[in-house]
Amino acid sequence: LKRFFADGTTGDYIFLVDEAHNLVERSREMYSAIIYKEDFLLAKKILKKYGQAKLMRELEKCNRVLLSYKRECEKYVIYESIGNFAFELMNVASDLDEFLQKAPEFPERKDLSEFYLNLRNFLNIYELLDDHYVVYAEHEQDGRFKLKLYCVDPSKNLQERINKGNATIFFSATLLPVGYYKSLLSTETDNYAVYAKTAFREEQKLLLLGNDVSSKYTRRSAGEFERIASYVKKTTDAKKGNYMVFFPSYKMMQQVCDVFLEKCQSDPSCETETLIQQPGMKEEERESFLQAFSEKLSGERKGSLAAFCVMGGIFGEGIDLKNEQLIGAIVV
């Protein structure tokens, strides 16, 4: 890829970006950077073993700055500028680079190299800072204190990459509101959007909402799982066919599935077959999982199929179940 897209290189390329709704958040993180105060103390501790007094002093300067940020931060603090601190970081990066090149192998080389690379990335992102960024400090839940260069609007950075080709097509089933995505994926103002009609007929759609249940962590209980499982069973009993039931986590999926299976076992008329997605499924296991959706069509199943899956997982997108192979989706 470097051969095609080195600095200053362009070509007759068309970039096709699938699932483009994910690109905004991924670009934000890609063009953002974080440093942790605790990492400076760890690096200082390592370098003390090897008599690197100058580097230790430079790391201590950075630690003192981060300590001052930490003391004034209750939850988070936004900074207009960190120019002086960035200069101190440059000194550390330069001398640490020299040390790593000259030093023989030592047990902590991997840890120190990771610290150096993270520091370099932070400084590289610092060079990109403009009004599309926010610089803030925050206490994380695990107690660590971080300083983050957060790319709120990645459009400028993405446009530099887009300009390396002749055209870019962003496509997704969920690029709405389209104005929001257009403003964050490109700086051009004359981009246009094409809306493709759904292949499904409106009269064939039935949208049902269960407003008395929630997937919030604070709401998760035996009673909540009972109500969700009841909704799943009522749906699969009402119309024979193949369904996918999506959950936010493996744990919640298993908890509701257990209740659902108990309900089916206690109901003699229930002929619903159940599948459940497993973590780290191999290719043959995935194929077997999907093959079950075609069995009903060949008369091998008496009742419905309820496939319990995890949202954002391997069965959440990129599969092609045609016609009656999938008649409904339940999203918890």
Predicted regions located by residue number:
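Conserved coupling segment at the C-terminus of the helicase ATP-binding
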Residues: K2-M244, P248-S269
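Residue-level signal for alpha-helix termini/capping positions
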Residues: N163, D237, S294, S298-R301, ...
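Conserved RecA-like ASCE ATPase "motif II neighborhood" in helicase/translocase motors
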Residues: L1-G11, F289, V310-F315
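Conserved motor-coupling elements within RecA-like helicase/translocase cores
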Residues: S266-C309
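A short beta-strand element within the Helicase C-terminal
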Residues: I319-V332
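Extended, charge-rich low-complexity interaction segments
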Residues: R227, V232, G299-E317
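Generic beta-strand/beta-sheet core signal
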Residues: V17, F171, N211, F246-P248, ...
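Short coil/turn connectors at secondary-structure junctions
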Residues: T10-D12, G165-N166, K302-S304, Q325-I327
